């Protein structure tokens, strides 16, 4: 049948595409001073029409709609699908590199990769990196570093107890 090492990268890629969709929300809203959770649903940047769930499936919806809003017909930037694909690929790569057994380390890298994706794409578009992303990375590093010593190559403090 299927083994976990074969299935895990595909699951990570699918999860990465979903996370990438949320990262697009952050990339669009943070530099504009908008909340990332209000409005809760995604909307067309041109006509502000709320996007129904079936038009918000990562990568597939953009391709199916040919990169256009189904309401007003205005183009939806190719950046949206690029972010979803890049996030998907990077999540799968992290899983391939670390394996499916070390989930805390994997999740920590996913978080750090996500912060870097937001910083990169906001910087490319607006030539800024929002403080929320910078301080989020600092906070994540400070919290995760002692919790997951493998992030910085240190052995686990519990390793000698085994």
What are these model-predicted stretches?
Residues 23, 27, 90, 94-98, ...:
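Alpha-helical membrane-inserting segments
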Residues 20, 79-85, 129-133:
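Membrane-interface loop-to-helix entry segments
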Residues 8, 36, 58, 81, ...:
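P-loop/Walker A nucleotide phosphate-binding surfaces of NTP-dependent enzymes
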Residues 29-33, 37, 96-100, 150-153:
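Transmembrane helix-loop junctions in multipass membrane proteins, especially transporters and channels
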Residues 23-80:
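Membrane-proximal soluble regions of multi-pass membrane proteins
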Residues 7-32:
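N-terminal signal-anchor transmembrane alpha helix
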Residues 1-5:
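Short, strongly hydrophobic alpha-helical membrane anchors
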Residues 12, 101, 105-162:
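Functional transmembrane core segments of multi-pass inner-membrane proteins
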């Amino acid at each position: 049948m299927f083994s976990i090492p074969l299935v895990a990268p595909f699951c990570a890629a699918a999860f990465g595409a979903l996370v990438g969709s949320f990262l697009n929300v952050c990339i669009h809203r943070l530099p504009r001073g908008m909340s990332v959770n209000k409005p809760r649903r995604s909307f067309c940047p041109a006509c502000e029409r709320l996007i129904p769930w079936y038009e918000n499936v990562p990568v597939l919806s953009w391709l199916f709609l040919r990169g256009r809003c189904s309401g007003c017909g205005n183009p939806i930037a190719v950046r949206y699908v690029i972010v979803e694909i890049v996030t998907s690929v990077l999540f799968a790569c992290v899983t391939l590199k670390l394996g499916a057994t070390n989930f805390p380390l994997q999740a920590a890298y996913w978080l750090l990769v996500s912060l870097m994706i937001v910083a990169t794409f906001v910087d490319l578009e607006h030539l800024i990196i929002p403080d929320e992303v910078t301080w989020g990375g600092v906070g994540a590093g400070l919290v995760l570093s002692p919790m997951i010593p493998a992030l910085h190559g240190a052995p686990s403090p519990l390793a000698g107890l085994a």
